[in-house]
């Protein structure tokens, strides 16, 4: 089940393909080519699988299913490789069956999500595997594609990584700009910054980025 924010992003992605931006050329969702050429009663089957030789970590299978069902709830989708599993080249991740027009309208959006998410998950897994012996956590950041954060951070989880913070609302993180603005950047005043943050948001974790042992000692 996708979150409301994820469902809204799926809807927006479909609208980019199926609804005219000015609502003049198309007043209803429309795949013009399929409407012109494909019998409305035609049935099609399809599948999604990795083409890359090295395979991939699966991420976004549930999103692809949501895309298909958002276009046509009657499309039957079967997930064969769940998110977080590994799929070899040519190994089917999911298969679907339904009205050909519906599948053609949804397939590119479904693939766009899956390609990006599988790539992110696969890269995250490489970092996780490379550092596993030291018990290192691989964290993500907020440097995400606008509107796609929920998917990209989920992909990091599928790859074995760890979400750092979803936004600016769920953790206090004092960076260089905050340090400069706090009491003129006094390196000995970070302890008071931590106290002020804790007083304002007592239930949130606090982190401080430091650039010297002096700043570290003050923050601690």
Can you describe what each PLM-predicted range is?
Residues 1-220:
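Acidic/glycine-rich phosphate/pyrophosphate-binding loops and surrounding catalytic core
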């Amino acid at each position: 089940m996708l979150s409301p924010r994820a469902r809204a992003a799926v809807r927006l992605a479909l609208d980019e393909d199926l609804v005219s931006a000015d609502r003049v050329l198309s007043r209803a969702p429309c795949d013009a080519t399929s409407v012109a050429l494909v019998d409305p009663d035609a049935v099609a089957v399809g599948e999604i699988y990795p083409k890359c030789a090295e395979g991939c970590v699966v991420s976004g299978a549930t999103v692809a299913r949501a895309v298909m069902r958002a276009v046509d709830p009657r499309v039957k989708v079967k997930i064969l490789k769940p998110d977080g599993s590994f799929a070899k080249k040519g190994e089917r991740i999911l298969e679907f069956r339904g009205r050909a027009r519906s599948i053609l309208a949804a397939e590119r959006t479904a693939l766009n999500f899956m390609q990006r998410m599988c790539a992110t998950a696969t890269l995250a897994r490489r970092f996780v595997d490379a550092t596993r012996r030291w018990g290192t956590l691989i964290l993500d950041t907020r440097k995400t594609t606008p509107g796609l954060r929920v998917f990209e951070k989920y992909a990091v989880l599928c790859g074995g990584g760890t979400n750092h913070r979803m936004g600016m609302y769920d953790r206090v993180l004092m960076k260089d700009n905050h340090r400069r603005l706090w009491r003129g950047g006094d390196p000995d005043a970070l302890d008071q910054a931590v106290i002020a943050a804790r007083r304002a948001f007592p239930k949130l974790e606090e982190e401080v980025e430091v650039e010297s042992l002096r700043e570290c000692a003050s923050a601690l």
